């Protein structure tokens, strides 16, 4: 009798565990969805049941060969596999306490972020050139591979580079600092160069397929907005630009929700040249407007300090107080500033 209860308890926990990890799209076939329809979903970029459950019906109907009735059936089956209803704040609090934080390499910066870069959400870093945005990205691409007890995420990193600033040599220097094998670290980083805004979005579909295959802890887009500044120009194209950017950020948020990866994006700043700039203490503001502001969970403002020191300020966060921390850019990545 005790044995049976134990087995039932084990079965319950395994069901619970399954409901939290991303489930491959092939699970829908077991629920009576036609194999051809599942293939169509996969070709359209839906690689997990979660991706289907989180998608609006309109998106499924746009797939060639999926009628409204089929879309309804697919969404109904996906909803059975993915818990999307209400839960108590206690349960949610429990789930939040299990969230992994990835170290930035600087103790002061980690303290400011209450542990590091949070997985399952979008962290945006913005600032002028030479403020350390890309250096933090390079350091994170290595620290996310560390064991959890050393402040890592025990997963691979994915790096989408839009400005051609990715340097594997920097990763090797950071790997040496943490006593990791350089070749293993480089093997665990998937790198892609994005050449235009459509390509940048297309890469996220590939990212989703790769995340199903192996465990990724971090997705970096450096910089998320650079190509939007050149592909769309003038006020006439502003609305089209913001819609495209909103779609890109929505996909990033979906990847963070689906796979629990930490998404880190960098953003550039624009100088305000209107009359109001004369009265502002700092006339620079991040580009992308309200759309990027609402999509990011945590926004960090980086600025130059003296010498190699940089200052990071929490610009916007749902739970972190507005505060500042100093860090330094060293030969072996981001570290603490020396007094």
UniProtKB/Swiss-Prot annotation:
SMART domains: AAA (SM00382). A motif (Nuclear export signal) lies at residues 245-260. ATP binds at residues 127-134. The modification Phosphotyrosine is found at residue 54. Residues 48-77 form the HhH domain. The keyword ATP-binding applies. Residues 184-257 are annotated as: Interaction with PALB2. Changing residue 14 to A: Abolished phosphorylation by PLK1 and subsequent phosphorylation by CK2. GO terms for biological process: cellular response to camptothecin; cellular response to cisplatin; cellular response to gamma radiation; cellular response to hydroxyurea; cellular response to ionizing radiation; chromosome organization involved in meiotic cell cycle; DNA damage response; DNA recombinase assembly. Keywords: Acetylation, ATP-binding, Chromosome, Cytoplasm, Cytoskeleton, Disease variant, DNA damage, DNA recombination, DNA repair, DNA-binding, Fanconi anemia, Isopeptide bond, Mitochondrion, Nucleotide-binding, Nucleus, Phosphoprotein, Ubl conjugation. Highly expressed in testis and thymus, followed by small intestine, placenta, colon, pancreas and ovary. Weakly expressed in breast. It is found in: Nucleus; Cytoplasm; Cytoplasm, Perinuclear region; Mitochondrion matrix. It is linked to Breast cancer: A common malignancy originating from breast epithelial tissue. Breast neoplasms can be distinguished by their histologic pattern. Invasive ductal carcinoma is by far the most common type. Breast cancer is etiologically and genetically heterogeneous. Important genetic factors have been indicated by familial occurrence and bilateral involvement. Mutations at more than one locus can be involved in different families or even in the same case. Mirror movements 2: A disorder characterized by contralateral involuntary movements that mirror voluntary ones. While mirror movements are occasionally found in young children, persistence beyond the age of 10 is abnormal. Mirror movements occur more commonly in the upper extremities. Forms linear homooligomers, giving rise to a RAD51 nucleoprotein filament, which is essential for strand-pairing reactions during DNA recombination. Interacts with BRCA1 and either directly or indirectly with p53. Interacts with XRCC3, RAD54L and RAD54B. Interacts with the BCDX2 subcomplex RAD51C:RAD51B. Component of the homologous recombination repair (HR) complex composed of ERCC5/XPG, BRCA2, PALB2, DSS1 and RAD51. Interacts directly with PALB2 which may serve as a scaffold for a HR complex containing PALB2, BRCA2, RAD51C, RAD51 and XRCC3. Interacts with RAD51AP1 and RAD51AP2. The nuclear localization may reside in the C-terminus (between 259 and 339 AA). Belongs to the RecA family. RAD51 subfamily. This is DNA repair protein RAD51 homolog 1. It comes from Homo sapiens (Human).
